[in-house]
A protein has these predicted regions:
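C-terminal structural segment of proteins
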Residues: 1-124
Length: 124
């Protein structure tokens, strides 16, 4: 790999500020981005870690009955927490990859990658 700055954002505001840098990339679970970096198919100037931003993790039902899922929520959490309200989404999340991928990969990363063969982009 090559040199880049690593930014560990603690809040959404910090992440947004860091991502305004030229060629900065958001890093969640890294299931797609890390192999892309290793293959030298991307060369961001900075990686902005979204891990640990509490407001980006979790699943809840809003006052108007909508399911809200934070972008940094791992697939395994989506599978567990969405089961009561959206069983099809929970089943989809529970069958992504293997347990290691489900515990590390995130719904936001999957949607941001927008691979047409991936599960979430076709479901949402």
């Amino acid at each position: 790999m090559y040199s880049f700055e690593f930014v560990k954002a603690k809040t959404v505001a910090e992440a947004v500020k860091a991502l305004k840098r030229e060629d900065a990339q958001a890093l969640g679970g890294g299931q797609t981005l890390i192999p892309t970096l290793r293959s030298r198919l991307a060369s961001p100037s900075a990686l902005v870690s979204l891990n640990g931003i509490a407001e980006m993790i979790g699943v809840c039902v809003t006052d108007d009955g909508m399911l809200a899922i934070g972008g940094a929520t791992p697939h395994a959490v989506v599978a567990k927490e969405a089961k009561k309200h959206y069983p099809a989404l929970a089943a989809l999340a529970g069958n992504i990859g293997d347990p290691a991928v489900r515990s590390r990969g995130t719904i936001g990363g999957s949607l941001a990658n927008n691979d047409p063969a991936a599960c979430y982009p076709s479901a949402v």
